[in-house]
């Protein structure tokens, strides 16, 4: 009996029953971009996903993958050519829903599946070969683009309005952004600039007068939704809270989506 329970306690644990274990991306390892090993890992993971399909109702990556397999000659991953993997990867938004909530084979399971990280690995290989489109890479330069957007906010907001059908059609042809998508408007000034002019006038006649808060404005509040930060600032000042503002720069998520991992590390620092 003791031996039986010992074996049970050492069996592979199913993932997603507890918090999944996420391993760091070792993008500097020589095998990370090895074409043969990457292709083998793609096929291994796709085959496991094909046999499970628990993630069928998440992002479009999985329906694309399963449809391709079902329509292949032998209805298996081996019937797919490596060139067919790209649409599956392109549909992944790196939202992590599969890894965090659905997949039963994430670490600590022996299958060690991390679908988003694998998609990122494939994109990194595509980037090295020059197969990623250049426009999304430029759109990922959030701080540069947003500073221009704020500087010329009236013109940019007018041009990006969905009612401006001609310019939105041209924008769609150039960038691939659907003309029906409502794009965020730019502030007439950054929240950081607004804060510098309005950080004083704190109400010190309150029980909260000795408290301090830092507002991390994020790129969206700093460049697009200033009123969110303004509202928070007003509430905090009225309650006597001393406020500081910080916007060190874009978090780097757009660079992650474009597989620019060194730039992501740089932004994190």
Language-model features, listed with the residues they occupy:
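Iron-sulfur-cluster electron-transfer modules
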Residues: 40-46, 75-250, 254-269
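Ferredoxin-type iron-sulfur electron-transfer modules and their immediate structural context
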Residues: 5-92, 101, 110-111, 125, ...
């Amino acid at each position: 009996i003791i031996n039986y329970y010992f074996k049970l306690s050492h069996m592979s644990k199913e993932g997603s029953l507890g918090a999944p274990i996420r391993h760091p991306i070792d993008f500097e390892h020589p095998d990370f971009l090895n074409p043969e090993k990457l292709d083998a890992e793609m096929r291994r993971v796709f085959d496991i996903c094909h046999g499970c399909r628990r993630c069928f109702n998440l992002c479009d990556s999985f329906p694309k993958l399963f449809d391709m397999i079902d329509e292949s000659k032998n209805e298996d991953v081996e019937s797919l050519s490596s060139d067919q993997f790209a649409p599956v990867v392109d549909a992944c938004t790196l939202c992590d829903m599969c890894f965090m909530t659905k997949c039963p084979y994430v670490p600590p399971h022996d299958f060690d599946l991390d679908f988003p990280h694998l998609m990122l690995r494939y994109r990194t290989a595509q980037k090295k070969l020059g197969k990623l489109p250049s426009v999304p890479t430029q759109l990922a330069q959030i701080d540069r683009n947003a500073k221009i957007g704020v500087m010329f906010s009236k013109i940019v907001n007018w041009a990006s309005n969905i009612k401006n059908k001609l310019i939105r059609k041209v924008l769609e042809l150039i960038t691939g952004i659907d003309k029906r998508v409502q794009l965020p408007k730019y502030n007439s000034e950054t929240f950081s600039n607004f804060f510098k002019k309005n950080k004083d006038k704190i109400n010190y006649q309150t029980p909260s007068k000795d408290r301090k808060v830092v507002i991390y404005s994020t790129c969206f509040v700093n460049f697009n939704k200033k009123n969110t930060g303004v509202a928070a600032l007003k509430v905090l000042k009225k309650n006597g809270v001393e406020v500081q503002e910080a916007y060190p720069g874009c978090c780097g998520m757009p660079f992650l989506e474009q597989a620019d991992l060194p730039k992501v590390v740089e932004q994190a620092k």
